[in-house]
Amino acid sequence: MKVVLRFKKRGMRRFLSTLESIKLVERSLRRADFPLVFTEGFHPKPKMSFLDAMPVGVVNLAFYVEIHLKDLSRKHLENLERTLPKDFPLAGAWICEENINKVVTSYRFKLITPYCMDLLSRKVEKKGKKISFGESVVDFEVFRAKEYSIFRYTQRRERLMNPLLLVEKDSFFVAICEEALTESGEDLSSFLERRGTRVKKSASG
């Protein structure tokens, strides 16, 4: 069976590299005695796949993992929840045969800063070229308060930019990947609710 797990990578865990995050997931699954399905060959590995890696330092609330299992019970999930660190919790689990890497087309981000700035005119270097941030977003919203500003936007997978490069160096900010989205703009968690079987309720926060 194929199962999709959603984790929330936050707190100090947001500073883990992609490889360290993958190792954390694999190690936690083994400790929780998940009945993993392995690849064939001389060096078998758990059959699992991940969505796009987010830059180190970005809070990732959409850390989805697709794994192949022999079976799954609530006991496995309870074991996993006890094994995981508090700043890398399990937020949802679904039995679903859909390939999430074929379903997801974009991501929704939130950027919180203590000041106002013109993000849309910012240019970021990507693969040796200066690319305008405004040209890479599908939608863009700004919410201003007395002491901070919240920028919310969506970017397609093929045009992802490191949100940490959008703010001034040494300034305070929080960059968050809120959710992965389908072609229609539906949250991946909602898509999994419709097309799969929920094993664990999706957590908020």
Labelled PLM ranges:
Residues 36-43, 91-95, 133:
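A short, aromatic/hydrophobic, helix- or strand-capping loop or linear motif
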Residues 37-67:
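Short, charge-patterned binding micro-sites
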Residues 121-205:
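Core RNA-modification/binding signature centered on pseudouridine synthases
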Residues 13-38:
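N-terminal ordered "arm"
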Residues 14-19, 71-74, 161:
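Ordered, soluble secondary-structure elements with a strong preference for glycine-centered loop motifs
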Residues 1-3:
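Extreme N-terminal starter segment of soluble prokaryotic enzymes
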Residues 7-9, 66-72, 111-115, 151-157:
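Short beta-strand-to-loop capping motifs
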Residues 60-110:
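Ordered, amphipathic secondary-structure segments that act as subunit-interaction surfaces
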